[in-house]
Amino acid sequence: MISGSDLRKGTTFELDGQVYTVIDFLHVKPGKGAAFVRTKLRNVIMGGVTDRTFNPTDKLQEAIIERKEMQYLYSDGELYYFMDQETFEQIPLNHEKVEDAIKFLKENMNAVIKFYKGEAFSVEAPNFVELLITECEPSVKGNTATTAMKTAVVETGATVMVPMFVEEGNTIRIDTRTGEYMERV
């Protein structure tokens, strides 16, 4: 059992016969009254998003999730194909199931696919990836009081904020959990 105060991004649980994963959460402690947890939930099976508020004392049934590392093969425009590296079985997934991870996945990269009762419902990119910058704004020198950042587009099409010294053609390491630049490789 999970208590309402244990809800975090990525937590998966059963509620009212449905399975939900937490997309976003906020612990609220008002000046008057009891604390509560405001969440944005995605229905794992149907794909819909809903807002729900929980008390910290609410008890929720944890869903049993299988995690399997698979290789991203290619996209045909509508579906994204992943291969089990043990059985060589290929599974197609639609954009709703890969939406956050696909920004950082290149062909032949490994990713973790989450399954609930044999049904794939989510893709997680590796925590850190190294990608080539294909487009980058020119560096403009100026009187900046803080670290100056500029926009860069990496080979997967994702947009990342990078420091001024990074140029087109550089390879950078990105934290896929936050989408932030980590370092130049």
From Swiss-Prot:
The gene is efp. GO terms for biological process: peptide biosynthetic process. Pathway: Protein biosynthesis; polypeptide chain elongation. Involved in peptide bond synthesis. Stimulates efficient translation and peptide-bond synthesis on native or reconstituted 70S ribosomes in vitro. Probably functions indirectly by altering the affinity of the ribosome for aminoacyl-tRNA, thus increasing their reactivity as acceptors for peptidyl transferase. Pfam families: EFP (PF01132), EFP_N (PF08207), Elong-fact-P_C (PF09285). One of its GO terms (cellular component) is cytoplasm. This is Elongation factor P. Keywords: Cytoplasm, Elongation factor, Protein biosynthesis.
